[in-house]
Amino acid sequence: MARAAGLRALVGIEAAGRGRRVAASPSPGGTPAASRGLPGWPGFCGVGCGSSSSSSFAPPRMQARRAAGSAARTRSPSQSNGWITGGSASEDGRLSWDYSSFKGRRPSMEDRFSIKMTTINEQTVSLFGVFDGHGGSLAAEYLKEHLFENLVNHPELLRDTKLAISQTFLKTDADFLESVSSNPFRDDGSTAVTAILVGNHLYVGNVGDSRVVALKAGKAVPLSEDHKPNRKDEQKRIEDAGGIVVFDDTWRVNGLLAMSRAFGNRALKHYVKAEPDIQEKVVDESLEYLILATDGLWDVMRNEDAVSLLKAQDGPKAAAMKLTEVAHSRLTLDNITCIVLQFHHGKSTNSN
């Protein structure tokens, strides 16, 4: 994502998860949580703080424990000419998912994604996220490696999931900025949109303009709202903090960044926060699919169009590929990454 003038990009693609080989080119077709000290999070240090490993952050009773056996059935990884795709299904058959990530017309790949299945105190927790880097891939890569690791070690994850998500986003942002503080010539940033499943509750947290859209009762239902500088509440927040919102091919914070919240972006941090908006939904039988995607998809596709394409496909594998192919065919200029998550209510499924 080209967001700020003069910021460098890194070449290459790295993403969590595993996949399968595909063709080289597509066919046509609230109140902030404290970011310092983190009240209510005693003993949490966070990535980049001291020498402790992530496994030592939380009290022992809340340590994330891997479920007996494999948490998910996963296909072999594959990556070819800027593409990476793949998918898995949960052991209990209630979830299946696929992802498709493509460099597209950009010279470098700044998107990342992460998928994590774990068990905490006998409660299954499933975490899905996409991260769209700008000014380089350092921030997106850091989120891929650390955001969910921090979250599953938060001592309040099961009791107060919204608090845990908010504090983890802010802490991980502070940790990232500390990790790159010795390099004044880099000012990478990233979006994050996440879907966290704890029991039958879904928590969607977003920072920036990546998006989650649900197929619910046959209709497209957005579960996140893009953080754009010209959104009235965001513009007021930025201007109250002393920043400005100006139009330069699109609306930008201080004439630079085309989103109003992000991880990283040290030079604009006073205006561009990593505080997430969080939505909580109960998972019932009307919830069929989720699409998590970067704006390489949403810039050229309405929510309703994406859901229509999804409904015409046979499962998440075909849907993830089709969404990416169509976005590319519509001449998106950005990297494209999407995760398609399917809910199987009252039945089990085998991975493809």
Curated annotation (Swiss-Prot):
InterPro entries: PP2C, PP2C_BS, PPM-type-like_dom_sf, PPM-type_phosphatase-like_dom. Residues 18-37, 53-87 are annotated as: Disordered. Keywords: Hydrolase, Magnesium, Manganese, Metal-binding, Protein phosphatase. Residues 96-343 form the PPM-type phosphatase domain. Pfam families: PP2C. Mn(2+) 2 binds at residues 132, 295, 334. It catalyses: O-phospho-L-seryl-[protein] + H2O = L-seryl-[protein] + phosphate; O-phospho-L-threonyl-[protein] + H2O = L-threonyl-[protein] + phosphate. Transmembrane segments: none annotated. Mn(2+) 1 binds at residues 132-133. One of its GO terms (molecular function) is metal ion binding. Its cofactor is Mg(2+); Mn(2+). One of its GO terms (biological process) is signal transduction. Its EC number is 3.1.3.16. Residues 23-37, 53-75 have a biased composition (Low complexity). It comes from the Eukaryota. PANTHER family: PROTEIN PHOSPHATASE. Belongs to the PP2C family. This is Probable protein phosphatase 2C 56.
